[in-house]
């Protein structure tokens, strides 16, 4: 490889400590949660690691024996995405003891469903969590950013 090409393919950008830390983002999820001044209280979300996503996938996967096909992997995708959203949500912390006790359930996913009980609130929250974890990134948008 020529010296010129080595500069183009500089691997130092990918070395530990060189990446930009994933940032917390504030996202309005529902108009129903307001502070004393009437301002919408945003949720705070932060992407989780690929390793944690892999763990969540394993935790939400079962295997079934299907005649003629053998052992088939079955991912509970609704639960998987809900768990990603739970793990990505910094505030409100649906895993907190206070919220779990207040909503009388040990399951943080159920807490989220009860808190976000109106129409599209729960779906909106799931979509935002999936989006910040890169599942909704449009490949064309990423290619355009890479060009700039």
Curated annotation (Swiss-Prot):
Domain of life: Bacteria
InterPro entries, sorted: XkdN-like, XkdN-like_sf
Signal peptide residues on this chain, from the entry's feature table: none
Gene3D superfamilies (UniProt xref): 3.30.2220.30
Family per record: To B.subtilis YqbN.
Name the record gives this protein: Phage-like element PBSX protein XkdN
Species in which this protein is naturally found: Bacillus subtilis (strain 168)
């Amino acid at each position: 490889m020529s010296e010129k090409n080595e500069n183009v393919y500089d691997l130092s950008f990918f070395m530990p400590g060189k990446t930009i830390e994933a940032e917390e983002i504030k996202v309005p999820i529902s108009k129903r949660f307001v502070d004393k001044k009437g301002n919408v209280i945003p949720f705070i979300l932060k992407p989780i690691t690929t390793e944690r996503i892999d763990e969540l996938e394993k935790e939400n996967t079962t295997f079934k024996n299907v005649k003629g096909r053998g052992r088939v992997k079955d991912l509970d995708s609704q639960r998987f995405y809900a768990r990603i959203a739970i793990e990505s949500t910094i505030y409100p912390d649906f895993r907190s003891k206070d919220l779990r006790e207040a909503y009388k359930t040990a399951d943080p996913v159920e807490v989220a469903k009860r808190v976000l009980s109106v129409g599209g609130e729960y779906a909106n929250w799931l979509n935002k969590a999936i989006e910040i974890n890169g599942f909704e990134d449009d490949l064309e948008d990423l290619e355009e950013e890479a060009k700039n």
